[in-house]
């Protein structure tokens, strides 16, 4: 995706799932698994997810499994890394879509029914360079499910938006 100039948009549940995905992304970056794009930016654009992440960071002894706790004992925070940017304000959120560099955007809601993810979908679904990566269950009747089921077009903010981005699901992370 990055090689073709695209971005990865991840609709994510704000509490728990976002932090789990940050953990995976930190490992990907640390291991250099995205060749030629080591310094890519990861945006977390959800006030609730940002606050939940702060709780995880501030209460590390209680929030992590043994593998993550071992990292903490080595002085490594398992969900904080270089290139991680949080967008708390509306202005910061809007600025993400003005950044034309390849990037990862984690935003709520996970099923795309509300929240800032809808703006990111509007700005990114039409572009075949991008990937929308679902990391959780998508209930019937939700926008997320429509995308996973192969919708050619969706309605966002009163406008029809063509679905040209690649739609993918990451198996094994849903709680369902």
Briefly describe each language-model feature range.
Residues 1-176:
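Acidic/His-rich, metal-assisted hydrolase cores and their charged scaffolds
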């Amino acid at each position: 995706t990055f090689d073709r100039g695209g971005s990865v948009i991840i609709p994510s549940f704000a509490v728990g799932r976002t932090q789990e995905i940050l953990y995976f992304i930190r490992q990907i970056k640390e291991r250099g698994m995205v060749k030629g794009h080591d310094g890519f930016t990861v945006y977390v654009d959800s006030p609730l997810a940002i606050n939940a992440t702060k709780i995880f960071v501030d209460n590390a002894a209680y929030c992590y499994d043994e593998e993550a706790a071992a990292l903490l004992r080595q002085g490594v925070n398992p969900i904080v890394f270089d290139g991680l940017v949080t967008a708390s304000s509306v202005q910061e959120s809007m600025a993400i879509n003005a950044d034309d560099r390849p990037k990862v955007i984690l935003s709520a809601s996970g099923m795309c029914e509300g929240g800032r993810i809808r703006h990111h979908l509007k700005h990114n679904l039409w572009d075949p360079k991008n990937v929308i990566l679902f990391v959780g269950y998508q209930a019937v009747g939700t926008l997320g499910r429509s995308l996973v089921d192969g919708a050619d077009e969706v309605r966002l903010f009163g406008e029809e938006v063509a679905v040209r981005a690649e739609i993918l699901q990451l198996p094994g992370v849903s709680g369902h």
